[in-house]
Amino acid sequence: MNYKLFSPYTIKDVTLKNRIVMSPMCMYSSKNEDGQITNFHLIHYGTRAAGQVGLVMIEATAVLPEGRISNKDLGIWDDSLIEGLHKATTFIHDNGAKAAIQLAHAGRKAELETDALAPSAIPFNETMKMPIEMSKHQIKDTVLAFQQAAVRSKQAGFDVIEIHGAHGYLINEFLSPLTNKRTDEYGGSPENRYRFLREIIESINEVWNGPLFVRISANDYHPDGLTVQDYVQYTKWMKEQGVDLIDCSSGAVVPARIDVYPGYQVQYAKHIKEHANIATGAVGLITTGAQAEQILNNNEADLIFIGRELLRNPYFPRIAANELGFELEEPYQYERAPGKISTNK
């Protein structure tokens, strides 16, 4: 029997062998605080590739040093960082998967000794530092940094780029009226709040012709914040600019209580897919093969982003295949150990 979860998926000239994506998750493991890939990262990402994930996405990787969430985040702000990232893509490719990278700037959520930057001088909460409102010069420099990061991503061998526009980081801060109180061309109307992301996409398109994803927070969980319907319009603009897929997460723009349950964010992937007519990725408490297969069969999303479940077991695709009764092609090195992997957590 054929299963959609294990069917190929092609975006532009990149074909994924299945619909399982390793969701980008910060590991805070650049131990020398220099943004460099370490041996841990090579093992971490390489193992998920060997575990038969279709697309392995490297964690949020800072386009500028001051754009890191922590001082142990990965970076792509300098050419000296390309070699390490290329080792990671080689590990991933050699183990049968495609490689993606999430380009990011933490904005006001950067927990560093340096000043935090944001569209407006509003802290995330009472315990975090007051950010500095970005000047137009700083905005232009950041747009350029995303473009340069895209060039380095290509040189490092990545197949896919994802722009991190979610979880209350810099791009998300520009998009949301809760965090963007500017009175210039980067604030006010939805068109103006989208301008920063528009310029980033434009700049990346000048140097990158591969698949381009954007991760969004499709719900601010605040009465004065953005909802999924607001993101339909944002997504239509992204699609016009050539974005290929929207990775639909939610929250973390402002402190909020979120009702979390299995597949709680799938509704956003479905809504964006239906109303903006674009491919989407579903993410958030998707933990079984049957659940993932149902999402795809219901046409609620095109790709399944798996996060913590892949931290629990890097061989999640094998477990999902066993659960569904699908015979997954194994790495030849493991063929001497056929049979089921335990699904015990």
Swiss-Prot record:
Catalyzed reactions: A + NADPH + H(+) = AH2 + NADP(+)
Residues where FMN binds: S23, P24, M25, C26, A60, Q102, R215, G307, R308
GO biological process, one term: response to toxic substance
Residues that bind substrate: Y28, H164, G165, A166, H167
InterPro entries per the UniProt record, alphabetical: Aldolase_TIM, NADPH_DH_bac, OxRdtase_FMN_N, YqjM-like
Keyword Zinc-finger: no
E.C. number: 1.6.99.1
Entries under CDD domains matching the protein: OYE_YqiM_FMN (cd02932)
GO terms for MF: FMN binding; NADP binding; NADPH dehydrogenase activity
Cofactor section: FMN
Xref: PANTHER family: NADPH DEHYDROGENASE C23G7.10C-RELATED
Function text: Catalyzes the reduction of the double bond of an array of alpha,beta-unsaturated aldehydes and ketones. It also reduces the nitro group of nitroester and nitroaromatic compounds. It could have a role in detoxification processes.
UniProt record similarity statement: Belongs to the NADH:flavin oxidoreductase/NADH oxidase family. NamA subfamily.
Assembly mode: Homotetramer.
Record protein name field: NADPH dehydrogenase
UniProt organism field: Bacillus cereus (strain Q1)
Gene expressing this chain: namA
